[in-house]
Amino acid sequence: MILDNINSPKDLKKYSVSELETVADEIREGLFNRLTKIGGHFGPNFGFVEATIALHYVFDSPNDKFVFDVSHQAYAHKMLTGRKAGYFDDSRFSEDSGYTNPDESEHDFFNIGHTSTSIALALGLAKGRDILGKKENIVAIIGDGSLSGGEALEALSVAGSELNSNFIVVVNDNEQAIAENHGGLYKNLKALRDSNGKSENNMFRAWGLDYIYEENGNDIASLIAVFEKVRDSNRPVVVHIHTQKGKGYELAEKDKEGWHWCVPFDRATGKPTVSFGSGESYLGMTSQYIVEKAKKDKDFVVVTPAMPMSVGLGPEERAKLGSQYIDTGIAEEAAVAIASGIARRGAKPLVVTNMTFLQRAYDQISQDVCINKTPVTMLMNYSSFDGLTDVTHLGIFGLAAFTNIPNLVVLCPSSAEEYISMLDWSLDSKQKENPVLILIPGNDVSHRPADKDYDDLNRFKIEQKGEKVAIIALGDFFQKGEAVASAIKEKCGFAPTLINPRFASGLDEELLHGLEKNHQLVLTLEDGILEGGFGQKFASFYGPDKMLVKITV
């Protein structure tokens, strides 16, 4: 295998184009070996193999610097920079994260996992290079889907006006984000593709950037030629290449959305080799709720920043929603502000995404929603330890980040009935005062009778009256609270009080004062971080008193 002899990009340069094509095949075998066994980002990596080879063939990494947007398409880059064991040796899979990581290699310059950041980061590298009087090439690599993010567009604007030196932006255009692209700029990209880059309506040139187009984005020889044209250029330039997402695996080529990311699967059939059970799930429950809600309530509208699958909205469900569905592209700030406007006008918006991405819209939540008290409902998935995949995709900071924003009601359901009741209450026509953030449970589905009305804010619910110890178990951790209560009764001989707080954004002070009569310890359980988290509210409340508080995360 030629790849056995490639331990750095320098080793790549001695091979012919035909041999490099063999290397591309070998890289895809490495991708298959890893992804069939542990899963990961499939389509982005299979579609960018040839471009990665050409980039490393033409440029001189790490002296020349690559910044991969999201970096979920960097697996081939890792194989060519001394990390191929993480793809061919099953025992070493854990050595390579799913994203670029400077701790792994001198060829990686940033920990990246969120989208639309590469152009700004690379622009900073270019400016720093110029200040220090250096001469290397700086290359940002970004997918067409990521261009919908405001940070990417802002950085392109800055590059076109503020930089007069080497700066290369490779736009990997596979005509797809995770789902289909949304936004007017994609009409411009299509016009450029259809005209082989010659359309006069060119947004990149409008920003003051040079531009070159390459239709054959999966042809190594063509890519080498175009990258050689821009190497050592003395002006910012966009290299727009047209690639095929999922190239090399027919199932992925036909279903770009479904194969953006994969679980372990059988290569011959494409079927998952892991079982998720046949029972109900909160994801399935959510998508069903949204579709039925839209059918019954024409004032209801779903807003998502390119993450419809975060709540199980596949192509079929999105088609059913019709005009009651808005995909803003990767634009969390715009999504939240748009939802605030929808709510102010009298309709009922539901913003859906993953918790790790909502933090990008913190200012809009605080300013455009909460200060204005617009009744926007935000529904977040992966807001717990469930589903954590990398340091860049942690949802566990959400409670600390959002529960302290004035006027925001944060609800943490502990059962299916409670979850649906909270959605119903938040989206009810009578509920016009409160912005609401609801965390989708990450546990297996559990069932328990639930209240229908949450107008009495911050009212906790005592599920089991007891003594001495009060267990306050939030959301996903309520099941753990039940287990702790049972263990205390069995081992200590008394029944503790078990409380389902439901609200994470405030305290039930009346209930907490009542606990002081016959309890000596309050134990809080939460799915988040300690500092600034839910439990610290109780430590602060009981600070002047004798009550002991134990916070467990």
Predicted regions and their residues:
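Cofactor-binding active-site loop characterized by glycine-rich and histidine/acidic residues
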Residues: 41-162, 300, 305, 314-315
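A glycine-rich helix N-cap at a beta->alpha junction
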Residues: 85-98, 160-179, 370-383
